[in-house]
Amino acid sequence: MDLAFSTEENIAAIASAVAPGQGAIAIVKVSGASAKEVVKNVVRTPSNKIWSSHKILYGHVIDKSTKKNIDEVLILIMDGPRSFTGEDVVEIHCHGGLIVVQQVLDAILKQPKTRRAFPGEFSQRAVLNGRLDITQAEAINDLIHARSQKAAQLAIAGIDGDITNKINYLREKLLDQLSEIEARIDFEEDLPKLNSKKLLTDLMLIRAELKQLINDAKQGSLIRNGLKVALVGLPNVGKSSILNLLSKHERAIVTDLPGTTRDLLESEIILEGVPITLIDTAGIRETNNEIEKIGVSLSQKTLFTADIVVLIFDLSKGWNKNDQNLLEKIPKGTPTLIIGNKADLKSQSTNIQPHATMTAITGEGEKELIQELLKLAGANELEGIEVALNQRQLDLVKVAVNALDQIEKVAAESLAWDFWTIDLREAIYKLGELTGEEVTEALLDRIFSRFCIGK
């Protein structure tokens, strides 16, 4: 899909979440050079008030073919450039529910030079018209999809321009260093010699700040994307009870019968600002039951996709060879917690030291389990993070750091200044691409195609 720079037509979309038959208010948004004329053609207002910017009008959306009212609406007008997109924008606030909202949108789309917006096209136009930079637009998308308060706070920081300001600050420093080097290349005899050691030290300080952004991005990803945590163990060790305990509601059926859970059950929780998807797996064992076999197979596959595995065993039976076999099936390198459950029934000695013990049916040990889980996830390092790069931004910063690494090698080999400028330009270009200083059509396509329609 090639949507970059396609701004000649008006675009329209439903700009609010709509569920069938639900919702008090919905919004249909129109943006473009003739957005006001488009909306005027489909509404009727009781007065002849001028359609002036940042005013709200009352009226009805009309079905032109029947002359009947489609809905009673409020109309919000925002003239460009004082609008989200920088173009004329009109919002029609109508009643919620799927049918009436779609009728309003259909009436708009029947107008000349008006089409349905592509995903992210409103935000794209805001960037093209200088209302936002790319990092701010991406932060808006992050805010819409935020799964915790911490994720929302990081997104707001991005919208406020914190990422752009930080990157621009470092990029300007690199530009200053590049200008010093190029001045010496062009006017070597007229300017004092550069101190290569001091210059390299300054560049390495910039590299250190970029590396800190990389480290913060890893933690930011934890806040933004969360973790997938698999609860695994032999049948009837209490996996479902632990899922219900952490979820604070009955998500899974709990019985004394082994093999009750035969499918993967998921529940999302927020712990210390980290979104965690808990996956209750079927007890892994040899079985002749075909349905249970499918559940066991799914459980084994989950071991390879989970960010963290919580291996639960029954303290009343102790750690046995089947528990050990299951532990050995967990892929090497996957962070794993070993939790002993049914501490109230403990009667067997165990030759393994669990990270925590608990009694899921009473809630005893829940706090310790959560602490161990957060420690393993690295959540204790989340405090103090002010900005967090997304994957696109992170990849570009990594390239910039690699370019500065090359400069360090160039300096060690005492190569000419021209060699310094090659990698310095690369770092500057990549940081410019991050903020949109260096923008391409393909870049815009890639970024905004991930947005929701109507934003």
From Swiss-Prot:
Cofactor annotation: K(+)
Protein location: Cytoplasm
Pfam family, one: TrmE_N
Organism domain of life: Bacteria
InterPro entries the record matches: G_TrmE, GTP-bd, GTP-bd_TrmE_N, GTPase_MnmE, MnmE_dom2, MnmE_helical, P-loop_NTPase, Small_GTP-bd
Transmembrane segments: none
Cofactor: how bound: Binds 1 potassium ion per subunit.
A GO-annotated cellular component: cytosol
NCBIfam families, per database record: mnmE_trmE_thdF (TIGR00450), PRK05291.1-3 (NF003661), small_GTP (TIGR00231)
This protein's name: tRNA modification GTPase MnmE
Species, as recorded: Prochlorococcus marinus (strain SARG / CCMP1375 / SS120)
